[in-house]
Regions:
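A short, N-terminal "cap"/entry segment at the start of jelly-roll beta-barrel domains
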Residues: 1-42
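Conserved hydrophobic/aromatic beta-strand scaffold that supports enzyme active sites
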Residues: 18, 27-29, 50, 67, ...
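A generic "binding-loop/recognition-motif" signal
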Residues: 23, 57, 66, 82, ...
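Residue-level recognition of conserved beta-strand positions in structured domain cores
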Residues: 29, 55, 62-64, 88, ...
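Tight coil/turn sites that cap or link beta-strands
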Residues: 35-36, 72-73, 79-81
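A short beta-strand-loop-beta hairpin characteristic of the jelly-roll/cupin
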Residues: 38, 44-45, 50-72
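Histidine-centered divalent metal-coordination motifs
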Residues: 43-44, 84
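Ligand-binding loop in jelly-roll beta-barrel domains
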Residues: 81-103
Length: 103
């Protein structure tokens, strides 16, 4: 398998693919093609999430930290119960994320 297999050029929604799931740890590939999280609907998860931007670019807002622009190679830990949202993703190329969900 390859992280870049079957990347959509355009899609109505983000594509989530589970790559591995083991006792309390889940790794997934997320592919965005211009999507963002609606301003009034941030994520607030029960688990820590470590994300790596593999390709493309994106804006990520995290409660208490503000917004930051992410480029390939950038990574961040989003603590459990911290509101966050994707403010934008590249429209001209797929944005590929690697997300690791931790207890």
């Amino acid at each position: 398998m390859n992280l870049f297999d079957d990347l959509p050029c355009q899609a109505d929604e983000e594509l989530f693919t589970e790559l591995l799931s083991r006792r309390g740890v889940r790794i997934e590939r997320i592919v965005s093609t211009g999507q963002s999280t609606p301003a009034g609907e941030p994520y607030n998860q029960e688990f820590d999430e470590w994300v790596l931007l593999v390709s493309g670019s994106a804006g990520l807002w995290i409660e208490g930290d503000g917004e930051r622009e992410l480029h390939p190679g950038d990574y961040i830990l989003i603590p459990a119960h911290r509101s966050h949202r994707v403010t934008w993703t590249a429209k001209d190329e797929p944005t590929v994320w690697l997300a690791v969900h931790l207890p």
